[in-house]
Amino acid sequence: MNPTFILAALCLGIASATLTFNHSLEAQWTKWKAMHNRLYGMNEEGWRRAVWEKNMKMIELHNQEYSQGKHSFTMAMNTFGDMTSEEFRQVMNGFQNRKPRKGKVFQEPLFYEAPRSVDWREKGYVTPVKNQGQCGSCWAFSATGALEGQMFRKTGKLVSLSEQNLVDCSGPQGNEGCNGGLMDYAFQYVADNGGLDSEESYPYEATEESCKYNPEYSVANDTGFVDIPKQEKALMKAVATVGPISVAIDAGHESFMFYKEGIYFEPDCSSEDMDHGVLVVGYGFESTESDNSKYWLVKNSWGEEWGMGGYIKMAKDRRNHCGIASAASYPTV
């Protein structure tokens, strides 16, 4: 954690004796701490309780507005409840929005009409939701998700791949472990390395360690990657014809942090400043096929408690909302 945040926590903790709390939330606070294994020092407890109550109030207000038809999604308290939005962005969002390596460019199939909805989970392309923990390794989970899908397409076998292998070993390609990275750099590592180990043989630790790649346990490979033009129409055709696609999004908002269900639309979302790598596993629409009811089906890496069992429906065909089409790619196998 950034020393600035630690200092802020200590300073506010010293003043915690003057903080006032909503005592009607006491039982919920105690239950939340137990559920998420939170143990605080004497000076930190008051500060974290204040942050948690602020987040709880924001969530309740949002959901009241949702019931009035002002929002298209709900929010819920989760494991991030005692974190400020600044801490959250620093710890959880590790996509580095910088100029990537150049891959091949996706060629949209001529005269192809994409189906109205796609869900690659139903075809066996997608492993269960994973959890990156407090490590900025979202890029690794996005990359393994896309490669898992392409290996299933090639072999008919779905094998969970090692994010830890990427976190520990893809530094020479430009990735920085828990401090962030790019999916294209991960795909390049697999090609350069000649393989990637299974998750079973090289389990996730949520911290960067020395590289322990063992070719005996390699279960996947790629020959490079394909970048998709920065348009939702191109992304839609890629998802429909290729499989799950790695994308980057702007996830640095409290609304995303506490998303629960519904179609996510955040007015302040950027289509250029992306900070989080995720996996598009399909798309669809709710009720009528109007623009406001279309969504991308996105797999996150924050565990099953977050969102819709670890997934989020993100607004589709609304001017590249949150930059979902700005940095899309997939590995070639």
From Swiss-Prot:
Subcellular localization, as worded in the UniProt entry: Lysosome; Apical cell membrane; Cytoplasmic vesicle, Secretory vesicle, Chromaffin granule; Secreted, Extracellular space
Disulfide bonds: C135-C178, C169-C211, C269-C322
UniProt keyword list: Cell membrane, Cytoplasmic vesicle, Disulfide bond, Hydrolase, Lysosome, Membrane, Metal-binding, Protease, Secreted, Signal, Thiol protease, Zinc, Zymogen
EC number, as in UniProt: 3.4.22.15
Residue numbers binding Zn(2+) 2: E163, E199
Predominant cellular place of this UniProt entry's protein: other
MF (Gene Ontology): cysteine-type endopeptidase activity; metal ion binding
Any Pfam family hit: Peptidase_C1
Highest rank taxon of the organism: Eukaryota
Binding positions for Zn(2+) 3 per the UniProt entry: D184, D227
BP-aspect Gene Ontology terms: antigen processing and presentation of peptide antigen; CD4-positive, alpha-beta T cell lineage commitment; collagen catabolic process; elastin catabolic process; enkephalin processing; protein autoprocessing; symbiont entry into host cell; zymogen activation
Site (Cleavage): F106, Q107, E108, Y112, E113, A114
Binding positions (Zn(2+) 6): D273
Binding-site residues for Zn(2+) 7, renumbered to this chain: D275
Binding site for Zn(2+) 4: E205, E209
InterPro entries registered for this protein in UniProt: Papain-like_cys_pep_sf (IPR038765), Pept_asp_AS (IPR025661), Pept_cys_AS (IPR000169), Pept_his_AS (IPR025660), Peptidase_C1A (IPR013128), Peptidase_C1A_C (IPR000668), Peptidase_C1A_papain-like (IPR039417), Prot_inhib_I29 (IPR013201)
Catalysed reaction equations from the record: Specificity close to that of papain. As compared to cathepsin B, cathepsin L exhibits higher activity toward protein substrates, but has little activity on Z-Arg-Arg-NHMec, and no peptidyl-dipeptidase activity
Regulation: Inhibited by the propeptide produced by autocleavage. Long isoform of CD74/Ii chain stabilizes the conformation of mature CTSL by binding to its active site and serving as a chaperone to help maintain a pool of mature enzyme in endocytic compartments and extracellular space of APCs. IFNG enhances the conversion into the CTSL mature and active form. Inhibited by CST6. Inhibited by the glycopeptide antibiotic teicoplanin. Inhibited by amantadine.
Cleavable signal peptide: 1-17
Gene Ontology CC: one annotated term: apical plasma membrane
Chain sites annotated for binding Zn(2+) 5: D250, H253
Purpose: Thiol protease important for the overall degradation of proteins in lysosomes. Plays a critical for normal cellular functions such as general protein turnover, antigen processing and bone remodeling. Involved in the solubilization of cross-linked TG/thyroglobulin and in the subsequent release of thyroid hormone thyroxine (T4) by limited proteolysis of TG/thyroglobulin in the thyroid follicle lumen. In neuroendocrine chromaffin cells secretory vesicles, catalyzes the prohormone proenkephalin processing to the active enkephalin peptide neurotransmitter.
Family from the record: Belongs to the peptidase C1 family.
Name of the protein this chain belongs to: Procathepsin L
Source lineage: Eukaryota, Metazoa, Chordata, Craniata, Vertebrata
Gene coding for it: CTSL
